[in-house]
Amino acid sequence: MTGDGMRLARTFLASFLVLLLEIALIRWMPAYIRLLSYFSNFILLASFLGIGIGCLLAPTRSRLFRWFPLVQAAVIAAVYWFRLELSVPTAGSIYFSSGTAEKVVLVESTMLLPVLFVIVAALFATLAQRMGREMAGLPPLRAYTANLAGSLAGVVTLGVMSWLELPPTVWFGVAFAAALPLLFTADQPAAEPAAQGAMGAPRPALLRGVVVTPLVGINVALLAGSLVLVSVMARGAIWSPYYKVTVSQKGPDTVVEVNNIFHQSMAPLDQKEYFYEWPYSAFGDTFDNVLILDAGSGTDVAAALRHGVKHVDAVEIDPSIIRLGRELNPDRPYSDPRVTVINDDARHFLRTTTRKYDLVVFALIDSLTMQSSFSGVRLESYMFTVESFANVRDRLEPDGVLVVYNYFRERWLVDRLANTAAAAFGEEPRVHVHEARAFLGVLMAGPRLAQLTAPPRIPDQVTAFNQSHEPSPARMHQRDPAIEPASDDWPFLYMRDRHVPQHYVVALAIVLVVSALSVVAALRVLGRGTTGGSAGWSWQFFLLGAGFMLLETKSIIQFALLWGSTWVVASVAIASVLTMALVANAVVARKSVTRPWLVAAVLVGLLALNYVVPIGRVTFESRAAESIFYALLVFSPILCAGLLFGSAIARSTAVSRDYGINLLGAMVGGVGEYLSLVTGFRALVVVIALCYIGAVAARVRETGVRQEVRVGG
């Protein structure tokens, strides 16, 4: 293999390792550090900062990659020794804690998150410097193509491992194997000569660049030790595509925990809370067809079967929870021939099914995790929007009813759901709550409420796993209409109102300060200063990165609305974005981009179309036609963005530096996503458009003249 061929292979391998490890950490760390299930975006931002800094430092003589095994071992050891439960002192948003304070160290989130941010950023800086050096030794477009291909391979590999439900030992084992060839080859700036043998003679082709030193041996041992520690931590757990799942027996209950938090318990129906059977207590055994969303291990299904329903569709997103329900639920509901178990996202099923139901149950829907690493939306957020409740209304029979029950924890959350139901159904829902039981509430809405002329007495006793048996009288709930319902544009169910929580503000401010200082330090190491107009900085690449990160986030959210919030959809969405970037790169390699302003104008026009045509606005009789229409709507801006970046990188005289600046911009774009907590997601389209307009303006300013870009691939 030629020198360029070897460098191309190492670029691919380094890019593969970077993205594989990035997604692996985003999945693995929240399984032990609880709050990261809701703040996984911080790991993503840290990785972008580290990759950006590492690429900026690619031309320097320092060899950061030699520290990669040690830093990775430190990250894994820190998670092992300090499995932290974070307290978030706020009533303005809801986070779920494990209730196992005796087993964890309590720390304040705004102090720990920046520490984790720095450690993870340092890890990716060691990797990215090596990746940047390999890219710098190649023609710009070939380097970027290899980078995209390696990244795509990383996404696909972890997706396959998730599909197979393989444990983290395998994830990190694949990363270990990918790191070995890089550890055993020379790590040097592209401008330095190839490694030589004794007395200055060139090495044989097969051994050229191969390095074997005591340090390499130590690093291999560190990687092996890290792998052993990961294996020890994963022992006894089931790794579903969404969580670390553990099962234990506590008295008569089989308890399921996900990411160290109580998720559900399995016990005979007679020992469970009354609300499972409340719809049948209120309306009698009059339901024929029932839909249960988030069916879990099957208790809600068992209740429906006890009361004589003819058919139950049980929808559950997590295949491992379904298996546990089949094997361990003492009532064996999933073995009943009247039950159809559907492994799907509940909102996607609502949008795509044509069946009608007498009863739709939202069964204790709490995901305890995020939709994807690229957004702050929780997995279940789109189930509790006005649009989702409208989907339920359309799936009800003329005398059907929706029932929602849960431990809502705050009064304002009950108000939000009641207001959402009122907006979707056009009539008042019926809601009762037990304030002394974490606002346990039952909400009913739909035309069958008109039949409830003499409702039964609500039980005072709430029998629940690991809770007090003291009486807790219920009261009817009068909703506060001032609490805003959640919508597909603003789906933040667990936030009282539109604001950026203070703990986010503090943590993000620290993150931005750390990032700014890191960039300044990196630029000074390069000897290029930090003042505006410095030759070492490109606002074009920075704005392209910020815009693309926001565009990717928007696209993944649109994907979830259209095809569901499953891990498959999230993986396909990320892979599709990378594929579109590869397609754009191929186009640029074959045809010059002579009018970047024209491409930007088309991009802005497509963004405007995305703004005025949200997912679901245009309906089709054919699901295939709907999918094609919205796929084109979502992906066409990404193609234009890829053309702009591809044409810019083709003209770069320092590809690793400009790619690093681009990743730093992406990190800032990730911070900008938190604006959606105030504005909603549609408003981000305006920010994306401004980023790309600014990038094209910066391109003209930085080059001094608009010129045709000709690329020889």
What is each stretch, according to the model?
Residues M1-G713:
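Alpha-helical transmembrane segments of multi-pass membrane proteins
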